[in-house]
């Protein structure tokens, strides 16, 4: 392998993960830190790495960069043609039925900025959470959803046209990270569920939403959704009529953090603040 590539990869890894981690035989870092490393390598070395690439060692990273350097860098448009083109139509189609069926109550919508980017971070109790959040928001919401919902060409096209993009849970999904960054950098609202899965009670939050806010400077808007678990509990296919409330909390604005190690460290503290804010909204 070219010595220059090895040196540059090692320098980037040391900057992002710290000298001790970068110099060890294995890159002992979580999926978010490895995603941070991948994006830093792309930015500084001018390459596009494979979305499904996994770095277990520094040699893995060097091999990935060496292979990527022989390929043209991908398009800056990571969202594809037609992304979100049916959002207003979906909002209009869902609005009246959801408000009627679930007596939808919306509180604190003034917390959502009238323009510019923001990350809406909500608890996740039910499959109804996404449509209820989309209807409650005063602006269109782009959102990431589990890849299983995109099975089949028709479902994939429909979700894409409504502003959804898939995320593979349980590991590093660079395509989802890139899409999320692109949405926020375009000044849009991004909906995220930091618990990572549906649960009857509020679970620990993953740091992705906080990291995204720190990476872009976008504010975090905590959201508490109550009633959807009763309307459509996990495992149910037929929703029941009941009341649903969507509460938007005051914005959490951690500011932009340009230093990768500091960003990773701060993301954990901001995540705790975010979870506490959502918990308070659910108790109201």
PLM regions with names:
Residues 19, 47, 139, 164, ...:
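Short glycine/serine/threonine/alanine-rich loop segments
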Residues 86, 175-284:
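Non-catalytic C-terminal accessory region of glycerolipid acyltransferases
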Residues 94-124:
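Helix-to-loop junction immediately C-terminal to a conserved catalytic motif
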Residues 114-171, 179:
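Catalytic core of membrane glycerolipid acyltransferases/transacylases, capturing the structured
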Residues 61, 96-101, 120-121, 166-171, ...:
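Short, flexible loop segments at the rims of nucleotide/cofactor-binding pockets, characterized by
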Residues 1-82:
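Phosphopantetheine-dependent thiolation modules in NRPS/PKS and related acyl-activating systems
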Residues 68-69, 124, 160-162, 237-241:
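Short, hinge-like loop/turn segments at secondary-structure boundaries
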Residues 84-103, 156, 160-163:
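Short hydrophobic helices that act as membrane-entry/anchoring signals
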């Amino acid at each position: 392998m070219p010595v220059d590539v090895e040196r540059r990869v090692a320098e980037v890894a040391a900057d992002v993960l710290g000298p001790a981690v970068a110099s060890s035989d294995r890159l002992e870092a979580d999926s978010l830190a490895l995603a941070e490393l991948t994006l830093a390598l792309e930015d500084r070395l001018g390459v596009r790495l494979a979305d499904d690439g996994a770095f277990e060692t520094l040699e893995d990273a060097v091999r990935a960069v060496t292979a990527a350097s022989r390929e043209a860098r991908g398009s800056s448009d990571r969202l594809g043609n037609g992304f979100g083109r049916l959002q207003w139509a979906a909002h209009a189609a869902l609005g009246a039925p959801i408000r009627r069926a679930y007596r939808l109550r919306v509180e604190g919508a003034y917390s959502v900025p009238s323009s510019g980017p923001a990350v809406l971070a909500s608890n996740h109790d039910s499959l109804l959470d996404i449509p209820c959040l989309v209807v409650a928001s005063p602006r269109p919401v782009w959102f990431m959803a589990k890849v299983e919902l995109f099975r089949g060409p028709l479902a994939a096209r429909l979700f894409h046209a409504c502003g959804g993009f898939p995320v593979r849970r349980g590991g590093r999904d660079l395509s989802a990270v890139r899409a999320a960054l692109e949405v926020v950098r375009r000044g849009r609202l991004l909906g995220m569920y930091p618990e990572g899965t549906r649960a009857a009670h509020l679970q620990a939050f993953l740091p992705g939403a906080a990291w995204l806010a720190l990476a872009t400077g976008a504010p975090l808007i905590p959201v508490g959704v109550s009633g959807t678990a009763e309307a459509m509990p996990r495992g149910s296919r037929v929703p029941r009529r009941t009341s649903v409330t969507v509460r938007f909390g005051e914005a959490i604005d951690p500011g932009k953090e340009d230093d990768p190690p500091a960003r990773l460290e701060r993301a954990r503290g901001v995540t705790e603040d975010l979870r506490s804010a959502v918990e308070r909204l659910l108790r109201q």
